[in-house]
Amino acid sequence: MASYLKLKAQEETWLQRHSRLILAILAGLGSLLTAYLTYTKLTEQPAAFCTGDGGCDLVLSSRWAEFLGIPTAAVGLLGFLGVLALAVLPDGLPLVKRWRWPALFGLVSAMTAFEMYMLYLMVAVLRQFCMYCTTAIILVAGLGLVTVLGHRWLDGGKLAFSYILVAFLTLVTTIGVYANQVPPPSPLAVGLAAHLRQIGGTMYGAYWCPHCQDQKELFGAAFDQVPYVECSPNGPGTPQAQECTEAGITSYPTWIINGRTYTGVRSLEALAVASGYPLEEGR
């Protein structure tokens, strides 16, 4: 009886028997999805079913849509292709049988941490729903579950420690990369921001507006000194903030400088002229 129970315990579950196939299917779907998003980003075409006034279009056009100068979707594509390769490679190849599952676990752990950060940005920072991003997150979560449950791991404690370590390193690297993607402000941006604050020149915008993000990026970190009014604190389609309504704001971004209204993204030089800031002081 004892030997029979031991034999039953050693039998593979249905998930363990089919885990590589399931991983290949999930990774294949993820590869197709991220390849499509990479294509739309590189060709500057809108993704299907995305509108220009909210949702996935705003997420996919945000500054987090690029990572180290390439589309963030391309990073996901590399991850999914890596999982696909590890899932389908035959055991007969050198080192594959021994290192397949440790490599899968490390790669999927990194992908999971990266996607969780993307989820945080989507929910807490951009506050927009992106069906493509959500689908990618679900696929990566599926890869994580199958990787953990679809293989007989000998040391659960070591596995948990490894995940924490990989996730920590991935998050630190990701946050560091995005933090350094914002260039230091130019002397013109610093001086102009201080001047706008002094004269009360104000930008009216919305956190979900991609053109507002473009305007902010022209200032870089100096934008923190620019007077700014958030006109849509509750998201697209909700009532405008009273201060914006009273100011007659109808589009974003809008500047009101010295009593005059300027709509759309404006260069730093144009804002300097409008506000009376001497350009030579910012050189």
UniProtKB/Swiss-Prot annotation:
Activity regulation, short description = Inhibited by ferulenol.
Q: Which InterPro entries match?
A: Thioredoxin-like_sf (IPR036249), VKOR (IPR012932), VKOR/LTO1 (IPR044698), VKOR_sf (IPR038354)
Please describe, based on the UniProt annotation, the reported consequence of changing C50A: Abolishes enzyme activity, but not with dithiothreitol as in vitro reductant
Name the residues that bind a quinone: 59-65, 111-122
**Topological domains, Periplasmic:** 42-66, 124-128, 180-283
GO cellular component terms, A-Z: membrane
Q: Which UniProt keywords apply?
A: Disulfide bond, Membrane, Oxidoreductase, Quinone, Redox-active center, Transmembrane, Transmembrane helix
Please give the function described in this protein's UniProt entry.
Thiol-disulfide oxidoreductase that catalyzes vitamin K-dependent disulfide bond formation in periplasmic target proteins.
What this protein is called in its record is: Vitamin K epoxide reductase homolog
